[in-house]
Amino acid sequence: MKRILTAVIVLLGGAPLCAGDFKAGFAAVKSVGDSVCTVSNSVIFSNDIVLVDFTLKPEAECDIRCRIALPPTKKWNGEFWGIGNNSFGGVLPPVYDLSAVIGSATATTDLGTSRYIKGEGRKQDVPPAVLRDYAWRATHLMTIYGKRIAKAFYGRDPHHAYFRGGSCGGRQGFSEAMRFPADYDGILSSIPAAFSTVSSAQFLNLYKQTHDEEGRALFTREQLRVVADAPIECMKDRDPKPYAGYVLANPILPERDIDGFLALAAKKDPSLADPDLMRRLKNIFMGVSRNGKTLCHGMLPGAYFGFKRGRSFEDKGGSLMTLRYRRLGFGKVASWDDYEDEVARVGGLMNACSTDLDAFRDRGGKLIVLCGWEDQTTPSPETVAWYEMLSEKYGGFGKTGEFCRLFALPGHAHGGGKGRISTGGGYTVDHLDLLRKWVEEKKAPDSYPHRWKEKDLTIPVPPYPLMCYQDDAGNWKTKRYPEGVLRRPDPSYMPFDPVH
């Protein structure tokens, strides 16, 4: 959405505003403040939308910054939208755009982490209270007080509440559905970083396989690009249209195909043929097992997870391991024993991986989940594994699809990467309408429009476990993904605490 924003800071008691209902509404908004919530005495007035900041302090160490955008009463559509953050928070995502386009009251939060991920704050130890804020509390309280502010400003409750977010924001959406099912009627969680313990295993394994014991990188960016491209070429004669030769139709590959594309990579770049390097590469894609239990499936073939030579993966997001690098109190995980300790200590807090969505389902909640088949940061096998386990609990994909649907987007990478088809959140305002229609009109989304700009093509991605492809005439068809290939994490490595 194109953003045009002219902002004026307005103080209480200052110059009068042109918004007719602002003064009375803001006086009511100020009354929302209590021992936890402090509403700012100043606002940002952009065109005819008011941006109100409020701070939440549920415990002494907490400092949760929030912002809500309030359209004028005559333009409010009656909806409340929560907006997710990215990475480890610390900044306020924009809320003006969505309010301006659809007319919703729109709120977000910095997750209470701003002082700990910037500058000197990164050297501080993070109190447990702030970890709770980041994991679940900031989003929940932002929602509670955001709705109260909307009601105070407009004189009535929102008729529906929705949430959308990607990566960290996708995790926030999962946490809301699992921990606070009454907060939202509909949630769109894209590329969710919701399985911190599993992502930690993937990234710890990735680091160990691509670095020596002194932390020196063993692969160049060019070598890893060859490895990322090899599966596309290896599968081009078996993949259907329109994917063949461009992206993988299905990156959940069996061991024989992993061996095949690694052999092709070594042929393309003979420097990769070293037996130790080939062993390390295979370990990246085959995942990790300990004591007979699977920790993670492995990284996705076709996804590019390159880095500058000599630089580690310390800045990668989405895992327990990297949170300590960002001073969120976890510390550098150096061994698999350390990893096990971290899982036991904080895994249940940081994960949003429960398969108990009874309360969310029973009150009519709807959850749309997106994952990307080239996601290099929150690898999608964990999301697919969770959805398969969820479907087993609720009697199959059909019954589960009555309240939760997963759409796997071919060629889609995480923000910060470069997907062969698309990169980032994977949604637009039009995509948000799919969620609203499901909640308000009971029209479940039978497909998710996935835009392939370079081919001027829109892929009608069906709900998992179906994939779509084109026949020789260019007509879209569907078939099921192969079963039994995904290496699911053992449930013991996916702990979940409802409220920690």
Model-derived features: positions:
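C-terminal His-loop and adjacent cap/lid subdomain of alpha/beta-hydrolase
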Residues: 20-500
